[in-house]
């Protein structure tokens, strides 16, 4: 039983499910990097609402990695005609924090 518990805990950690996102830090990152000029939690502004992003990618095991790519390098055509600009000045850790946080915002 102990082995099963350890295995389950290890799988949860490896999958990222047990990884808690620091919401306050993520919101501060979003504010400081201009994300909230185009996005909000529940309403479309210029870009999609974070809840819509969550809904679109919720079943994608690579969602966080995809979002990291879009935040770092920008993207075109995923959410309409207006492209998302790249954010090359953000650290990889900050980008990952934002991507993980976005995936916690449910409709």
Annotate each predicted stretch with a short phrase.
Residues 39, 72, 103-106:
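Protein kinase-like catalytic domain
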Residues 1-24, 107:
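N-terminal export/targeting leaders of redox proteins
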Residues 46-57, 72-99:
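Axial heme c-ligation environment in periplasmic c-type cytochrome domains
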Residues 56-66:
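Short microdomains enriched in Cys/His and/or Lys/Arg
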Residues 15-30, 45, 56:
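Electrostatic cytochrome c docking/interface patches
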Residues 33-41, 98:
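The canonical Cys-X-X-Cys-His
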Residues 35, 75-77, 107:
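Generic structural signal for secondary-structure transition and capping sites
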């Amino acid at each position: 039983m102990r082995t099963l518990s350890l295995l389950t805990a290890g799988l949860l950690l490896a999958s990222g499910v047990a990884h808690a996102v620091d919401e306050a830090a993520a919101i501060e990152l979003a504010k400081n990097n201009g994300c909230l000029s185009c996005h909000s939690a529940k309403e479309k502004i210029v870009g999609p609402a974070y809840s819509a992003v969550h809904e679109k990618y919720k079943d994608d095991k690579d969602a966080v990695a995809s979002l990291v790519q879009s935040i770092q390098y920008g993207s075109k055509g995923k959410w309409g005609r207006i492209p998302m600009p790249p954010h090359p000045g953000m650290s990889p850790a900050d980008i990952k924090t934002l991507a993980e946080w976005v995936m916690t915002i449910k409709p």
